[in-house]
Amino acid sequence: MAKYEILYIIRPNIEEEAKNALVARFDSILTDNGATVVESKDWEKRRLAYEIQDFREGIYHVVNVEANDATALNEFDRLSKINGDILRHMIVKLDA
């Protein structure tokens, strides 16, 4: 299984319950499509280098994933692009 790290930035004015639901939803998207979530944690609320959608801060969330193929990652990528609560995301394949 290949190991991946996903980092996404959540808008800072989201309520705690909505943020937890968003994280749970995107973790389940990964697991429903065949990936294994090793770790999913909030990093911290940080100032952004530049404004994204009129926000100067964002809540960083990191997910470590193991997957056999890119199906789960492609679905995560597709859905995170159309979700208004996620400002940016990045998927990186980790070295073995």
From Swiss-Prot:
Organism: Streptococcus thermophilus (strain ATCC BAA-491 / LMD-9)
GO cellular component: cytoplasm; ribonucleoprotein complex; ribosome
Chain segments annotated as coiled-coil in the UniProt record: none
Protein name per UniProt: Small ribosomal subunit protein bS6
RNA-binding in keyword set: yes
GO process terms (BP): translation
Family: Belongs to the bacterial ribosomal protein bS6 family.
Protein task: Binds together with bS18 to 16S ribosomal RNA.
Pfam family, one: Ribosomal_S6
PANTHER family: MITOCHONDRIAL 28S RIBOSOMAL PROTEIN S6, SMALL RIBOSOMAL SUBUNIT PROTEIN BS6M
Keywords recorded for this protein, A-Z: Ribonucleoprotein, Ribosomal protein, RNA-binding, rRNA-binding
GO molecular-function terms, A-Z: small ribosomal subunit rRNA binding; structural constituent of ribosome
SUPFAM superfamilies in alphabetical order: Ribosomal protein S6
